[in-house]
């Protein structure tokens, strides 16, 4: 049953119905639509539109419908309704007759869908927060297990300075903590109830919208009816928050894909999250990580989609806004499975310590320590930087590490170099000198892990 038929004399085109109907997408708002309708029944009862008995009958029928559909969700799509609101209203009328036709009094699908969508975002957002916390905990546990595993740190994908795997883990811990904060903030801003805003000008019935908001567990009602039905900031912000988090997931995936490559071989991934080749029997591919990286693009696409949809819409509601849900649902689904998969990857990850250490000892990653040593002897840093560059060129020509030069050879580059240079060139010294807040020295890593676990 269409909710708007009286104005029209001709039949709706079958093609237009297929084009216009949103039930194949917005069926996911069923529970929120029922919950909102139950609260609305109480609201219209409070202003005398229906009696207490009628309100009770409506609420019972709505709760019965909730149970029925949860038992057989296929009922919704089989109905052929235009949208989820039409389905709920038609099913309600089938249960209670003309009483069901009273429920929509004072309400528009505009404030109805805005409320449904915010309820859905609050529910799914809470589940996403839990997933982010789980990933954060898994990464912190990995940092604790491998806090002292030495590996090369990179800039420009070139070996730069030695770090620990624990330090690498904590870098992403910081990123996911910001994701948690962003999502929590977004949910706080979305925690207002549009119900009672009507089509655009507000409902004609003087109900208590504060009580209505509280009944639906919102922090407060919205304050402007035009904004209430036009606003999709919460959709944009959730997609934006997801996009930033997916960027972090994708960067982590890229790091791990490289660390897992035969060329690096710093880590091993569990069989649980890898697959093989149909042709090459030796292959063990990091498909979970590659899919995380790949799904990031579709999340970005949905963000751009909703921004483009909303960018030129006049107030208030426009049918364009029906396009807000498909991208949002896909964003939430993609983000959720990627968070779960990333946590699973980390839970079975093993660091190949000898390989990672060997790589850290190569590539002249201790060059900065030699420059710092020269500075400690009184040489200006810029001059020390130049001298060490010359030492590296000579070392490459001889195919030896810096520490294999004899003292006499080193003195040809800088006469101030003495025997005490060699302890400064060890991996242990490179790490130990970074004993500053945020640094890669082992005490700093341990303190950072302990502080985060204590929260």
UniProtKB/Swiss-Prot annotation:
Record-level GO cellular component terms: cytosol
> What EC number(s) has UniProt assigned to this enzyme?
4.3.2.1
Q: Which SUPFAM superfamilies match?
A: L-aspartase-like
Pfam families reported in the protein's UniProt record: ASL_C2, Lyase_1
Q: Which UniProt keywords apply?
A: Amino-acid biosynthesis, Arginine biosynthesis, Cytoplasm, Lyase
Similarity-based family: Belongs to the lyase 1 family. Argininosuccinate lyase subfamily.
Protein name per UniProt: Argininosuccinate lyase
Record organism: Shewanella baltica (strain OS185)
Upper taxonomic lineage: Bacteria, Pseudomonadati, Pseudomonadota, Gammaproteobacteria, Alteromonadales
């Amino acid at each position: 049953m269409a909710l708007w038929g009286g104005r029209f004399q001709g039949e709706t085109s079958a093609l237009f119905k297929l084009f216009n109907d949103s039930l194949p997408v917005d069926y996911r708002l069923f529970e929120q639509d029922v919950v909102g309708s139950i609260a609305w029944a109480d609201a219209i009862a409070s202003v005398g539109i229906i009696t207490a008995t009628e309100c009770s009958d409506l609420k019972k029928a709505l709760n019965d419908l909730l149970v029925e559909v949860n038992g057989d969700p296929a009922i919704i799509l089989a109905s052929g309704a235009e949208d989820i609101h039409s389905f709920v209203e038609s099913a309600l009328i089938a249960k209670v007759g003309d009483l069901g036709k009273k429920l929509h009094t004072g309400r528009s699908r505009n404030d109805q869908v805005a409320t449904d969508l915010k309820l859905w975002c609050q529910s799914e957002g809470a589940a996403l927060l839990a997933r982010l916390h789980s990933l954060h905990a898994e990464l912190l546990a990995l940092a604790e297990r491998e806090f002292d595993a030495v590996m090369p740190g990179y800039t420009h994908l070139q070996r730069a300075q030695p770090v620990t795997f624990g330090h690498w883990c904590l870098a992403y811990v910081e990123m996911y903590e910001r994701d948690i904060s962003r999502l929590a903030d977004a949910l706080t801003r979305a925690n207002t109830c549009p119900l009672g805003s009507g089509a655009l000008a507000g409902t004609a019935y003087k109900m208590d919208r504060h009580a209505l908001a509280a009944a639906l567990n919102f922090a407060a009602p919205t304050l402007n009816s035009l904004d209430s039905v036009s606003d999709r900031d919460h959709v944009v912000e959730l997609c934006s928050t997801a996009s930033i988090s997916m960027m972090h997931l994708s960067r982590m995936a890229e790091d791990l894909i490289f660390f897992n490559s035969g060329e690096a071989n710093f880590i091993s991934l569990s069989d649980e999250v890898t697959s093989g080749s149909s042709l090459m029997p030796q292959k063990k591919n990091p498909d979970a990580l590659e899919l995380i990286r790949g799904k990031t693009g579709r999340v970005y696409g949905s963000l751009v989609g909703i921004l483009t949809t909303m960018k030129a819409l006049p107030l208030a509601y426009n049918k364009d806004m029906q396009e807000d849900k498909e991208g949002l649902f896909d964003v939430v689904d993609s983000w959720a499975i990627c968070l779960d998969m990333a946590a699973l990857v980390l839970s079975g990850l093993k660091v190949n310590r000898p390989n990672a250490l060997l790589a850290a000892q190569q590539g002249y990653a201790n060059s900065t320590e030699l420059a710092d040593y020269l500075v400690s002897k009184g040489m200006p840093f810029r001059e020390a930087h130049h001298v060490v560059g010359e030492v590296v060129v000579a070392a490459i020509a001889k195919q030896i590490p810096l520490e294999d030069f004899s003292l006499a050879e080193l003195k040809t580059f800088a006469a101030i170099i003495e025997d005490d240079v060699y302890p400064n060139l060890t991996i242990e010294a490179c790490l130990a000198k970074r004993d500053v807040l945020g640094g890669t020295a082992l005490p700093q890593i341990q303190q950072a892990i302990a502080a985060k676990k204590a929260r």
